[in-house]
């Protein structure tokens, strides 16, 4: 005969056994490219979704947190060659591929993931009408391992169907100086 205590313990064990393993899984590592990009876009989509992603490049500390050492160096070189008072070579928000951030929702796809490199593609949707060219909604993040941590080594996208890359834009700005 079952006692009330045995019945309760059996029911509790059944509930625990049926609970999703994800409920007990560790949260995603901040050193995981998908988790990093997800965190960037979760922040960019907050509120009205107009905050953008400038926080990843707003100062040297932010750049060091998110970007690879080689990209930080390249950016510093480009900034050093920008005349005082001028806007640097990156004059838009690369996270939202815009001058006026608008992120309502986003979808991440891992295009490549191996031991030292990763490519994460993000398709963003805003509150306003989508761009005429669908490829303008996709931003790609190229990651590399930098001192054992995943860092963004390039951000790329398209405007009016024409591709752009942060790394290429920075390199091009240095060519214009020489």
Task: Please state what every model-predicted region is.
Residues 1-13:
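N-terminal secretory signal peptides and thylakoid transit peptides that target proteins
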Residues 12-15, 119:
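Localized chelating/binding microdomains
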Residues 117, 127-137, 146, 151-178:
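Low-complexity, intrinsically disordered terminal/linker segments enriched in charged
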């Amino acid at each position: 005969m079952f006692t009330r205590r045995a019945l309760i313990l059996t029911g509790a064990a059944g509930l625990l056994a049926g609970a999703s393993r994800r409920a007990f899984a560790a949260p995603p590592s901040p050193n995981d490219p998908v988790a990093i990009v997800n965190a960037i876009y979760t922040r960019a989509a907050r509120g009205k979704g107009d905050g953008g992603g400038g926080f990843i490049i707003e100062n040297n500390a932010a750049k060091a947190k998110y970007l690879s050492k080689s990209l930080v160096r390249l950016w510093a070189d480009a900034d050093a060659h920008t005349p005082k008072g001028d806007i640097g070579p990156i004059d838009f928000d690369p996270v939202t591929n815009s001058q006026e951030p608008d992120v309502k929702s986003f979808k991440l796809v891992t295009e490549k993931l191996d031991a030292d490199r990763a490519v994460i593609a993000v398709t963003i949707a805003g509150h306003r009408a989508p761009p005429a060219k669908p490829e303008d909604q996709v931003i790609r993040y190229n990651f590399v391992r930098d001192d054992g941590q995943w860092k963004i080594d390039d951000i790329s996208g398209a405007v009016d169907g024409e591709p752009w890359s942060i790394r290429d834009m920075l390199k091009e700005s240095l060519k214009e100086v020489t």
